[in-house]
């Protein structure tokens, strides 16, 4: 039953006859990657400096200066109904000091019940006609980071290719670009900015009308949408952080910032022009070996179903990490942030840094 409702949610989001510009188009690319960043509530816009950077701020790749890095992450949502995976590789380029990276992201839901053929043209129900299908979102990111003259300033760019598939019903291709900037000030403060979908990201859909639609008693259900193109508008993430040395063994790095969506949403600050959501997170590091992290984000105004009163919800997160030489294992846990939901998701990620192994 859960997968039936999940499938209906997917259909309503993808095949609706809404405007071409949709609020949650390619939303899977906003999840992030790496249990470190997810445990800190996304508070890594100005301090993520490894192979996970393309998903947060590609300018952070510039700190990979010795050898290549590889990473992988796996997570499951809604009691394992949805599965999210990430794999990436990054390497500095010897000729000009820049860093190149390639990342692949997948979010998929398998075994969704297909009931489009359950009722025949005369209105008779045949449960044997129920089948199943999978819905998957894929993205490949090609990233490049460089320093445009100043050693304190770095710039990064993502080129994104998106492929989305909804069983036999529809598939779509999209492309777009992200732009990131990092600045490390003299006083140790780090400033970061990430403009997602900087030129807008465009998806072109192909719909299989024969598989999607159903005719019952002469009336057509699930007609193909009129618009075959959807546009993802830019989003701006801003962050500021600083690393504090508590003593010889302990360091604390907090970050705070704003996520700005150029459309009207349920964010705590929302106008017709933009919606602004604050976030914050911190990492406590012991001897660069053990890490404890917390974060909070996704503040939004919601209506309580029982009392019908307006209130603010948010998404807390936490996690730990352990590092040995060039191998880092991270874990994060977070909930959906919807009305105090008890649905928690677990994230595991593994990073290999050959620069640490060989030095």
Each model region followed by its residue ranges:
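Sec-dependent N-terminal signal peptides
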Residues: 4-12
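Sec/Tat signal peptide C-region and signal peptidase I cleavage site
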Residues: 14-18
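Subset of outer-membrane beta-barrel
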Residues: 19-359
């Amino acid at each position: 039953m859960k997968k039936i409702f999940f499938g209906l949610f997917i259909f309503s989001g993808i095949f609706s006859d809404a405007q071409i510009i949709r609020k949650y188009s390619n939303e899977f690319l906003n999840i992030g990657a790496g249990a470190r960043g997810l445990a800190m509530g996304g508070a890594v816009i100005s301090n993520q400096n490894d192979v996970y950077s393309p998903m947060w701020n590609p300018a952070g790749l510039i700190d990979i200066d010795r050898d290549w890095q590889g990473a992988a992450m796996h997570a499951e949502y809604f009691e394992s109904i949805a599965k999210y995976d990430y794999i990436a590789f990054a390497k500095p380029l010897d000729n000009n000091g820049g860093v190149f990276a390639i990342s692949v992201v997948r979010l998929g839901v398998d075994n969704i019940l297909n009931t489009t053929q359950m009722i025949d043209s005369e209105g008779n129900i045949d449960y044997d006609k129920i089948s199943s299908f999978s819905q998957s979102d894929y993205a490949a990111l090609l990233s490049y980071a460089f320093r445009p003259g100043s050693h304190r300033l770095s710039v990064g760019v993502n080129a994104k290719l998106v492929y989305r598939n909804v069983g036999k019903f529809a598939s779509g291709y999209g492309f777009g670009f992200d732009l990131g900037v990092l600045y490390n000030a003299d006083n140790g403060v780090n400033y970061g900015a990430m403009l997602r979908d900087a030129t807008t990201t465009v998806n072109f859909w192909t719909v299989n009308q024969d598989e999607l639609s159903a005719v019952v008693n002469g009336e057509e259900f699930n007609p193909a949408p009129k618009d075959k193109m959807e546009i993802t508008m830019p989003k701006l993430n801003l962050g500021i952080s600083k690393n504090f040395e508590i003593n010889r063994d302990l360091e604390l790095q907090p970050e705070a910032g704003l996520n700005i969506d150029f459309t009207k949403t349920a964010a705590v600050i929302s106008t017709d022009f933009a919606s602004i959501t604050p976030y914050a997170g911190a990492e406590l590091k012991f001897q660069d070996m053990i890490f404890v992290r917390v974060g909070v984000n996704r503040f939004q105004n919601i209506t309580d179903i029982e009392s019908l009163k307006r209130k603010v919800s948010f998404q807390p997160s936490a996690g730990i990490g352990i590092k040995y030489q060039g191998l880092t294992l991270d874990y994060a846990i977070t909930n959906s942030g919807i009305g105090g939901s008890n649905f928690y998701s677990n994230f595991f990620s593994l990073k290999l840094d050959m620069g640490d192994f060989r030095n």
